[in-house]
Amino acid sequence: MSDTEKDKDVPMVDSHEATEEPPTTSTNTPSFPHLAQEQAKEESATLGAEVAHKKINYEQEAQKLEEKALRFLAKQTHPVIIPSFASWFDISKIHEIEKRSNPDFFNDSSRFKTPKAYKDTRNFIINTYRLSPYEYLTITAVRRNVAMDVASIVKIHAFLEKWGLINYQIDPRTKPSLIGPSFTGHFQVVLDTPQGLKPFLPENVIKQEVEGGDGAEPQVKKEFPVNLTIKKNVYDSAQDFNALQDESRNSRQIHKVYICHTCGNESINVRYHNLRARDTNLCSRCFQEGHFGANFQSSDFIRLENNGNSVKKNWSDQEMLLLLEGIEMYEDQWEKIADHVGGHKRVEDCIEKFLSLPIEDNYIREVVGSTLNGKGGDSRDGSVSGSKLMECVNDAVQTLLQGDDKLGKVSDKSREISEKYIEESQAIIQELVKLTMEKLESKFTKLCDLETQLEMEKLKYVKESEKMLNDRLSLSKQILDLNKSLEELNVSKKLVLISEQVDSGIQLVEKDQEGDDEDGNTATGHGVKRVGKEGEEVGEGDSIAKLQPQVYKPWSL
């Protein structure tokens, strides 16, 4: 191999090695830190230039973030039903009904109560309910997660529940009102009434007298029986039938209870069963009012009557006590009494049980007791044998029917009643007379007031007339002074008042009548004379308007 070939081969190897070495050196950045820094600067500069050339679209970025957030939202697992009467609701807007129902958030009364705060709270409550629409959403659960005052939360919660936007399709058994411990019967509550409100119950006292004894026995007071639940009617066939059964067998019996799906009340007599939703039952009231949702119709329900024999007929001590309490509280309002007893008891059951109670009659016992004491019967324990009891009853009836002083008592009673009515009528008549006298006095006082007012008006008119007369005299005096001054100035015209013209006309007429009387040619011919202003006798004639009519004008120069 020649030297030239060697020389040619060596550079080829060197060039190959040279070309392969740079990648190894570029990957080993620690060996050349200054090269890595320069490369990073160049990359950052190129990226900055690319970002400067590209414009950022914020709407697209926000949409991308929303799409990413949608991945973490809870999926809808239950169908949500909105009632037909709340079809105006739109979760993205605030309706006018909401503004009228919650005006605190829309009148700028507080900086914490704004439309945005209302909308956020409303949407949070609705979305929380829609996560589990079959469970009741309470106010406490909302309070724990919403930073708002309690009054506003209660208002919004009540508004949404009223319009069926929340708690519309819940299970009635999840309502807080139905959650509670079951009745065990060991708590007995007795009705306590103040002493002033208790009804008067006459004490059943039987006076006992012992004939032929050394001394009289003390009176024994038999108190009125308050706790009547210990007594039982042994002639009740249904109760006897229930008494024959064992308690263990009664406890094993299954008593079905049908609860209304809408209101949560118990449907006792009649229920409406849904043919499409087999677990849904409605009471008669909710069915008649149409509270069965928008996705059902009335034809989807069938009317079923509960079996009355399945209702529990026997009465417990607690129910008997509640019945007596209800009768004492509500008297003859049997519907309220049945509600007070509760359970499966109807109005008919309460009335039937009350009639079957062995309540004793105090009046008959008083008559029987007095008769027994009169005959010397044994009445220590209040119990009498059959024959003695019949004799006492017959004697009591005869004493009541054969009363000798009945007519006298009736006449005395009627006389007392008539006297009472006469006294009342006299008092009423006296009151009427007194009222009429007061009425007349008030009228007289008003007349006196009117009379004094008239007198004051009369004095006022007299003063005004005097004032006008003085003004007239002063005015005539001024006119005379003016006429004198006009005469001094050789002015032929004079000032004359209208009233003076009338007076001058009257004087002229009087002078003419006087001349006619002297000539014997009087117009009237009566021959009556009268004295004028200057003491001359003037004959009385006709009126001035007929003799010499004149047209008067206001005075002027």
Curated annotation (Swiss-Prot):
Location relative to the cell: Nucleus
Domain SANT residue range list: 310-362
One Gene Ontology biological process: nucleosome disassembly
A molecular function GO annotation: zinc ion binding
Main location: nucleus
Compositional bias (Basic and acidic residues): 1-19
Residue ranges, compositional bias (Low complexity): 21-31
Binding site for Zn(2+): C260, C263, C283, C286
Domain SWIRM span(s) in chain numbering: 80-177
PROSITE patterns: SANT (PS51293), SWIRM (PS50934), ZF_ZZ_2 (PS50135)
Keyword annotations from UniProtKB, A to Z: Chromatin regulator, Coiled coil, DNA-binding, Metal-binding, Nucleus, Phosphoprotein, Transcription, Transcription regulation, Zinc, Zinc-finger
Residues annotated with Phosphoserine modification: S485
GO CC annotation: chromatin; nucleus; RSC-type complex; SWI/SNF complex
PANTHER family documented for this protein: CHROMATIN STRUCTURE-REMODELING COMPLEX PROTEIN RSC8, SWI/SNF COMPLEX-RELATED
Function according to Swiss-Prot or TrEMBL: Component of the chromatin structure-remodeling complex (RSC), which is involved in transcription regulation and nucleosome positioning. RSC is responsible for the transfer of a histone octamer from a nucleosome core particle to naked DNA. The reaction requires ATP and involves an activated RSC-nucleosome intermediate. Remodeling reaction also involves DNA translocation, DNA twist and conformational change.
Assembly with partners or alone: Dimerizes via the C-terminal coiled coil. Interacts directly with HTL1, NPL6, RSC6 and the N-terminus of STH1. Component of the two forms of the RSC complex composed of at least either RSC1 or RSC2, and ARP7, ARP9, LDB7, NPL6, RSC3, RSC30, RSC4, RSC58, RSC6, RSC8, RSC9, SFH1, STH1, HTL1 and probably RTT102. The complexes interact with histone and histone variant components of centromeric chromatin.
Protein name (Swiss-Prot/TrEMBL): Chromatin structure-remodeling complex protein RSC8
Native source organism of the sequence: Saccharomyces cerevisiae (strain ATCC 204508 / S288c) (Baker's yeast)
